Structures are given as C-alpha cells and as structure tokens.
Amino acid sequence: AEILARTYQLDESYYPELLKDVTDFLTQLTAMGMITEDLHLISSIPSVSMIIAGICIKLYGSAELISPNFKPFYHEFSDDDTSQEIELVTTPPPSRCYGQVLLQNSEMTVFENPDRYVVLFPQMQNLYEAHMLKDGTYVRVYCHPQVSETNIENLFHAIRLFFLFTAQRNGLFAIHSASVLYQGKAWLFSGHSGMGKSTHTALWHE
C-alpha cells in the first residue's frame, strides 16, 4: 500500500484507506482461489512437544483439542531437532483452491498444489481441510473449535496421518496390528481389518 501511495504521489493521510482497499482486494482474490496465502506457522508457542519413534513434533493451537493418547509421547526438545510442526487453526480456510486430485476415496481426498498438499476428510465434519508443505515439515489443520470426544478423535487420526507421512520420509513405516506384552517382550499380531487381532490379544490378557 505504501508503494502504491508513493507511485501515485498520494498524501500520507490516504495510507490507512489504501491499505484497507488492498487488503480487501487480496482477500477477494484468495477467496476466489486466484491466489493462495503462504503456508507458514502462525503461532509462536507450541501447546505440546512430543517425540514419536525419534521424530520430534510440535503441536500448536488449542490444547483442549489434542488427544490424551499423545500424552505418553510428550517430551521437550530443542528447536533445531524439530521434524514437523502441526498447527490447529479453528477457523474455516480462506479459500477453496484445491489443485489436482491425487487420491480420492470415501475417507479422504488429496490435492496437489505447487507448494503443498491439501487434504479433505469427508467423513469428519469438524475438519474443514488440512494443508501440508510438500516436505511435511509444516501442517495447518483447519478445524471446528468445539471440544468433543468425536472432534478430538478425528483430529487424532488427522495428526497421525501427517506424522506417518514424515515417518515414511525418515525411513519408518507403520504396521496395522495388535500387540501384547509377554515375558518382557512385545508380541505383534498383524493382519487386515476384521481378521481378529484385537480378539486374539484379548484372549491373551484373559
């Protein structure tokens, strides 16, 4: 706005009005999907820091929306060790600029943009969408601010998805399984959904 004012030799008294006009114009372009806002961290202080399988993650946003399932992994670490930052933003996204479809099924739709992936979760009503930089270092999840068991669980699954992306880039992978601790060792039972893994491990506990 200041550059425009100087270009057209406007008096400084016009600066506030000009700044508002420029901001409104950019907001309209963003809403129409003609431009996309830069994807960067908004918050300054993380709500939670945790380490999972050696991967250091910082979560930003409302601590009430973060699942207690993450508590066993809470751990402080230096900023230099951060592998991924995930930010929960409790407002709708400013635009609907999705890009090219990479994956689409009943659970999610993944779009590719020049600088990011955009993920929609059709079955999770409290999640508007999520934007992740292509290297996975930063994720912004647009979600509803309401704190409920369902909303927290949905966010847990979304956060897990983006963690697994970073894990894969670090040579790690996840196995769909159930496990029991027996004689000081973890025994892993792997198989597709519905095979009876949880039922089998429950029998071990009995």
Language-model region placement:
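Short strand->helix junction
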Residues: L10-Y15, S148, G194
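Short, intrinsically disordered, charge-balanced linker/junction segments flanking boundaries
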Residues: A1, L29, A202-E206
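Short amphipathic alpha-helical interface segments
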Residues: A1-E12
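Glycine-rich phosphate-binding P-loop
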Residues: V180-E206
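A noncatalytic interaction/capping subdomain that flanks phosphate/NTP-handling catalytic cores
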Residues: A5, P16-L18, T23-A186
